[in-house]
A protein has these predicted regions:
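Generic beta-strand structural signal
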Residues: 25, 92, 108, 123-129
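Metal-dependent enolase-superfamily TIM-barrel catalytic cores that perform enediolate-based chemistry
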Residues: 114-152
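N-terminal amphipathic alpha-helix/helix-capping segment at the start of soluble metabolic enzymes
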Residues: 1-3, 14, 20, 80, ...
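Structured beta-strand/loop patches that form or line metal/cofactor-binding pockets in enzymes
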Residues: 1-37, 42-49
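Generic detector of short, locally flexible boundary/turn motifs and exposed helical patches
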Residues: 1-6, 78-79, 90-95, 118-122, ...
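Short, low-complexity, polar/charged sequence segments that are solvent-exposed and flexible
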Residues: 17-21, 46-48, 56-60, 146-150
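Metal- or metallocofactor-binding catalytic centers and their adjacent structured scaffolds
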Residues: 30-107
Length: 152
């Protein structure tokens, strides 16, 4: 697990916090064939009670157990047996689980939505943007940038 800190160009404010950077954890899962899956989790003390340090500790504490999982069924069994632990570390688990799902899709050469029984994504995609609770002038400037980029 690697931590990721990316500074914002301007502070981002919402009801729970004001932040000057994003913090995330990245997990890399590798198969015996050398394929790599990546997963990300965003621990937030004010949302999940997690920190980057606690997510890293969760990963260090259980990595050896996950390494014995040879299938998604094994990982699901581990998750079921440790549901309370996962509930206390949801962002850390998200990074692990997403890395495993990404790897599974690559191993099967299928998009993960197909592997999980869905239909392949297609068509035009819509992206969203987030506006924080900054000063009105900053809010307005960012809104104009988003509108110019095609966000509606």
């Amino acid at each position: 697990m690697t931590s990721l800190d990316i500074p914002f160009r301007q502070a981002f404010t919402h009801a729970s916090a004001t932040r000057v950077k994003t913090e995330a954890v990245l997990v890399r899962a590798e198969s015996a064939r050398g394929l790599v899956g990546m997963g990300e989790g965003c621990p937030r003390q004010y949302v999940t009670g997690e920190t980057v340090a606690s997510a890293q500790e969760f990963f260090r504490s259980h990595r050896a157990e996950w390494m014995t999982c040879s299938s998604m069924d094994d990982l699901q069994t581990w998750g079921t047996a440790h549901a309370d632990l996962i509930d206390r570390n949801p962002a850390a688990w998200c990074a692990v689980e997403t890395a495993c799902l990404d790897l599974l899709g690559k191993e099967l050469e299928q998009p993960i939505e197909v592997v999980l029984g869905g239909t392949p994504l297609s068509g035009p995609f819509r992206y969203s943007a987030v506006l924080g609770g900054e000063k009105f002038s900053s809010f307005e400037k960012q809104l104009r940038q988003y509108l110019a980029a095609g966000f509606i």
